């Protein structure tokens, strides 16, 4: 029997992971290739980041820096740069030797944090819809996932703070937050974060915050790290990443910043995952984090223009568009098109329009909540987005 051991007693896959098969990203990317469609599904840029940072990686390779195992916590140059970044942008002070840990991207940072801090029986609250690795990480740690759903209201997806409070029980160990939020593009406000901080202190909760889109906020939105609120530094693990900010997603360089005790705990799990990774790229990312503010401003402006281009094209094609305040994803409602099943819609869209998108329902425990929503990525070249908009309008 497929998937069974030779004696047929139980499936090969650990039962904690039985709900996680091939990801929707693999399925839709394969569809994009087989239909020669424009892939606006998976969130990676179609151009590389700054040339001087690529050259920094080449220089590190040639100089023999990082070609062997780098230090377990990360190379000192990168840890120092991460601490300087947090101080410069947010006024948060971290000791690069004791309060910074470099990881193999944010995905490992999430997994290591959950494996380190969560035990069987612990409840973990996550904002739904959520990045798919959250569910897998909680499952691998043996925790119980408790979703709190963001729902559309007045053009954006909003958090119901009362619902969040009600979700906390005596078994709640940890809040897993993501702001700017993938896939909805919501950026939690200073006021919302203040209430979350009060709740965490009151109920003595740990918090892991995924802030990989920290520099991709638009219009009047503001990214405010939760660790800066009263009582939060000592209970918050903050996750960052180079991939989204510098358009080098393949380098897999992420990090956490937290207290010495929390960093030590996460490192205890991380060292048995990758141990170390991305040696030469760590030196390059250290230089990237030191780029002038003008780099971050220009990057935001470019993505804001692309957001507006794709949002306008989607609106013209008949979608209801939730204009994101952050990230590089646009969530749409397909019901104005006479559709209600995001899975069926996305599987048919490549043949129908030559464009690939992702059904948001894959990011929900409550699949019915996400059924009519579809996500498009706009971290692509302008001409690609223009072509996608034309195809969608023509297929209307």
Q: Which sequence ranges carry the predicted segments?
A:
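Helix C-cap/helix->beta junction micro-motif
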Residues: 35, 141, 202-203, 317, ...
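Conserved core segment of the aminotransferase class I/II
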Residues: 7, 229, 233-304, 313, ...
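PLP-dependent enzyme catalytic core of the Aspartate aminotransferase-like
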Residues: 2, 166, 348-357, 362-396
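Active-site phosphate-binding strand-loop segment of PLP-dependent enzymes
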Residues: 146, 150-219
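N-terminal small-domain helix-loop-helix segment of the aminotransferase-like
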Residues: 5-9, 14-105, 112, 160-163, ...
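Conserved glycine-rich beta-strand-loop-beta hairpin in the small C-terminal domain of fold type I
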Residues: 286, 302-311, 321-334
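Conserved PLP-anchoring active-site segment centered on the Schiff-base-forming lysine
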Residues: 116-138
